Amino acid sequence: MNEADARPTNFIRQIIDEDLATGKHNSVHTRFPPEPNGYLHIGHAKSICLNFGIAQDYQGKCNLRFDDTNPVKEDVEYINSIQKDVQWLGFQWDGNVHYSSDYFDQLYQYAIELINKGLAYVDELSAEEIREYRGTLKEPGKNSPYRSRSVEENLALFEKMRAGGFEEGKACLRAKIDMASPFIVMRDPVLYRIKFAEHHQTGNKWCIYPMYDFTHCISDALENITHSLCTLEFQDNRRLYDWVLDNITIPCHPRQYEFSRLNLEYTVMSKRKLNQLVTENIVDGWDDPRMPTISGLRRRGYTAESIREFCQRIGVTKQDNNVEMASLEACIRDDLNENAPRAMAVIDPVRLVIENMPEGEEILTAPNHPNKPEMGTREVPFSREIYIDRADFKEEANRQYKRLVLGKEVRLRNAYVIKAERVEKDEQGEITTIYCTYDPQTLNKDPADGRKVKGVIHWVSIPHAIPAEIRLYDRLFSVPNPGAEEDFLSTINPESLVIRQGFVEASLKDAAIEKAYQFEREGYFCADKLSTADKLVFNRTVGLRDTWAKISKQG
């Protein structure tokens, strides 16, 4: 199989293959054009992987262009975070970063060209009146009383707009197309509006700003984009995209192709809703590990490789569909199962004393990965007092319980076989200490007399245990499609974050931020950005097994 055969295929790649085969294009040039008004989320990751991935596979180019035409909502903070996210995902844009604002002078001249051709006019209807005049899907729109202005009058009024001669909302530039069009987007769409706001790139040079539909197609053309890829909600906008380029003097005419957006269950993708979660302090910022933002996923412990794999698995189609959270989790679980070093952590600790073990410590050797000897080993201190997880002990249990039971044996991971002899309880009847004996001949081997010990549990030596805050993250919402609810905040999962105070083994003392580990028998975790030498904090990335099938049945 050659490299081309190994590439993922989809309808967009088939179009590109045909364009190259017929000579329509000699090379491929795509772009990723986010608006810098928020943090990127997993849906943007799909677009990033598509646009940059196509450029890579076809030895082409992909631009990063900020669609910065609304200075009121934009911020340099978002520009910086978006660049970081793209690079973290493993991609690099061609040349310098582009901005739609780079083209404001040309866009203004193209607007004048449309006015000169009688294809644009200055309208003084209010925004509400424009909506009323636009009509509905069943009723055609009505012409604005300002639609018949002369070219000369429109040129003068447009210049007045630019010079700040109108208040915000008192005038706009509209395309003159067809108020009876069956496509509402073609009913004289607004091309320019007035905003007295300082722009992060152009300062106070402009008080009129072009609309997305006017800016987007011209920016594509000026950058010689061959294939302009966007999500399905822009399907009708393609008519306006082509109309603008057909009616101005510009040599390049890119084509727009639409694909389905990513809808992930148990979360929301709307920037407005995500912003509400942040501003109402329901989450801890845009990078809260429960957020679907790339920065949130990164903080939770997702790797760039797992997100790229997820985007490849879900594919590119024209049909909208909901993707199960299990699909995303399967990608990170597969990645970390293969690559994450193992460690031991006790999340709900109970003290265990091995009465027949001498004082002091014994240094044991544990593999960093059971199937990858090349990942080496680590030293794990063992002593007569250890922590085990409270759920790993019962005074009485049936045969299905393969952990420690009073009067029975279990193996300690990478250590010895122990037997529970007795327990100590507090006044409330809560077990405070489990007293055991151990078989010193069973270090990583079966008992000499042939008796079978089936269960294995993890542990941490108390004298060497490091206190850690363990953050158990779950889905943020309790219903699969919270965005469809009348009040999406009413569906917040109250157990989306459970904090435990536990202990981790000594080797994790210097765990690097975002470094992934498998806490044996517990799941995959990473050190949080709030983790310090004095207070370790670990985030659960994902459990060891898929819990979504069970959740789906319950739902």
UniProtKB/Swiss-Prot annotation:
A motif ('KMSKS' region) lies at residues 268-272. L-glutamine binds at D67, Y212. It holds the Pfam family tRNA-synt_1c_C. The keyword Amino-acid biosynthesis does not apply. ATP binds at residues 35-37, 41-47, 231, 261-262, 269-271. It comes from Proteus mirabilis (strain HI4320). The gene is glnS. This is Glutamine--tRNA ligase. One of its GO terms (molecular function) is glutamine-tRNA ligase activity. NCBIfam families: glnS (TIGR00440), PRK14703.1 (NF011291). It is an enzyme of class 6 (ligase). Monomer. It catalyses: tRNA(Gln) + L-glutamine + ATP = L-glutaminyl-tRNA(Gln) + AMP + diphosphate. Keywords: Aminoacyl-tRNA synthetase, ATP-binding, Cytoplasm, Ligase, Nucleotide-binding, Protein biosynthesis. GO terms for cellular component: cytosol. One of its GO terms (biological process) is glutamyl-tRNA aminoacylation. It is found in: Cytoplasm.
